[in-house]
């Protein structure tokens, strides 16, 4: 059978694409977060055989379903013209003020849309799925970019961090502070007691970064906003303040307690949950640290703001600091952001693949349905040509329905795309990171442009 041979040939071509293109796409997405070796591509006989059988089975079932009604009829009935279905009123006709103002062409279009229910839902669901995929693709990219810009441009306000050695002497600490206070390139420096600790609840445990600093100082380097209301948070001595992702992992809310196991150990109470996207940070005041954990907090790190964040300025200051005894490490916030933003370039490849696949699917859906639309209504189209319709008007008669159905599909796809985007964001988040969960308006606009091109 030549058709079967052609179909199996197409299946083989698609398998080659599936074994090469999609593994690379998924692998590229994982390289955003992880350092991974080069990918090795392999073909699997069992998967290939299953895909061939599934493709043949789906094609056969669809063909039988389409031909079943025809095969049940007699040859004589098949040779006679099919009797038109009895006319039915559409719901728009019951809205008389609207129906009276519609032109004849628009009334015909409305009747045809609701007359062919299968074609209506096939087109709407098909276009809706394509739109949802494109929105999800653009939405994922905007979420990742939003995460970095929000975290490092709006929430974090410090240029660098200097960490002292564990055995730093008081005079070494004083020397570092004197240098920071006397250097004109340093706008301000905020001392804090920084350490790593394990946070534990009955259902989960993970590692977080604990920073103890005065409530009137933290606002100079970090903005804390309530994760629900967006209102600014003012730290107090009633508990610790944790990020939203950590609260979800620990399944705790304001007023709950969890165990903190670090330089000191003890139960702490959640006083607030703030908006945050990268890493886990637990903030508390020195007063609460002493009351809850029964220990004093000595500054062992400094959060710095420079007059300029350029590389030369930072390196010059870091060089002098690292030459001082008692200084262990220095880190520049811009380097962290640049590294992440560079990895975000890989997302563009994934987005392009999603957009091309969705646009191709939309074109196939519309092409096939347009052909079916014309084939099933040859007599109707011939009749309106006899009534005096020009070729352009006959084409518009058909395309007008496709455009309306596409608009319905886009509307459905906007709702589907929003929830698909949220699902993908939550599914791809790792424990140490939370992505932006709102769908950017640009994702809807760009998806509308791309889905309209095949139409």
Labelled PLM ranges:
Residues 1-12, 449-455:
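Single conserved hydrophobic/aromatic residue that forms the stacking wall/gate
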Residues 6-22, 383-424:
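Transmembrane alpha-helical interface segments in multi-pass membrane proteins
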Residues 140, 144-153, 314-363, 373-376, ...:
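Peri-transmembrane interface segments
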């Amino acid at each position: 059978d030549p058709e079967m041979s052609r179909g199996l040939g197409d299946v083989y071509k698609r398998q080659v694409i599936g074994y090469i293109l999609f593994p690379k796409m998924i692998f590229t997405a994982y390289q955003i977060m992880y350092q991974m070796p080069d990918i090795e591509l392999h073909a699997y006989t069992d998967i290939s055989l299953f895909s061939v059988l599934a493709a043949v089975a789906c094609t056969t079932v669809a063909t039988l379903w389409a031909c079943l009604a025809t095969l049940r009829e007699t040859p004589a009935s098949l040779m006679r013209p099919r009797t038109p279905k009895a006319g039915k009123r559409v719901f728009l006709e019951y809205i008389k003020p609207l129906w009276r103002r519609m032109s004849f062409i628009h009334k015909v279009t409305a009747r045809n849309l609701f007359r062919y229910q299968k074609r209506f839902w096939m087109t709407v669901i098909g276009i809706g799925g394509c739109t949802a995929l494109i929105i999800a693709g653009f939405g994922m990219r905007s979420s990742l970019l939003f995460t970095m810009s929000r975290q490092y441009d709006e929430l974090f306000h410090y240029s660098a961090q200097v960490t002292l050695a564990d055995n730093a002497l008081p005079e070494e600490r004083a020397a570092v502070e004197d240098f920071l206070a006397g250097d004109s390139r340093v706008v301000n420096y905020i001392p804090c007691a920084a350490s790593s600790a394990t946070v534990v609840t009955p259902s989960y445990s993970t590692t977080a970064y604990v920073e103890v600093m005065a409530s009137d100082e933290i606002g100079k380097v970090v903005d804390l906003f309530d994760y629900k209301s967006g209102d600014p948070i003012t730290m107090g001595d009633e508990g610790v303040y944790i990020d939203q992702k950590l609260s979800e992992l620990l399944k705790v809310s304001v007023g709950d307690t969890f165990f903190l196991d670090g330089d000191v150990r003890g139960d702490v109470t959640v006083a607030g949950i703030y908006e945050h996207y990268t890493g886990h940070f637990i903030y508390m005041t020195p007063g609460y640290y002493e009351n809850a954990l029964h220990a004093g907090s000595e500054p062992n790190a400094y959060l710095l703001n420079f007059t300029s964040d350029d590389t030369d300025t930072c390196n010059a200051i870091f060089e002098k600091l690292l030459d001082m005894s008692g200084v262990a490490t220095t880190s520049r916030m811009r380097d962290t952001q640049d590294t992440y933003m560079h990895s975000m370039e890989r997302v563009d490849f994934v987005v392009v693949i999603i957009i091309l696949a969705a646009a191709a699917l939309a074109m196939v859906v519309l092409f096939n349905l347009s052909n079916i639309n014309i084939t099933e209504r040859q007599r109707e189209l011939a009749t309106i040509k006899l009534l005096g319709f020009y070729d352009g008007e006959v084409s518009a008669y058909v395309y007008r329905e496709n455009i309306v159905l596409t608009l319905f599909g886009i509307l459905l796809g906007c709702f589907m795309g929003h929830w698909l985007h949220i699902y993908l964001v939550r599914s791809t988040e790792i424990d140490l990171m939370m992505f932006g969960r709102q769908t950017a308006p640009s994702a809807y606009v760009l998806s509308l442009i791309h889905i309209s091109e095949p139409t």
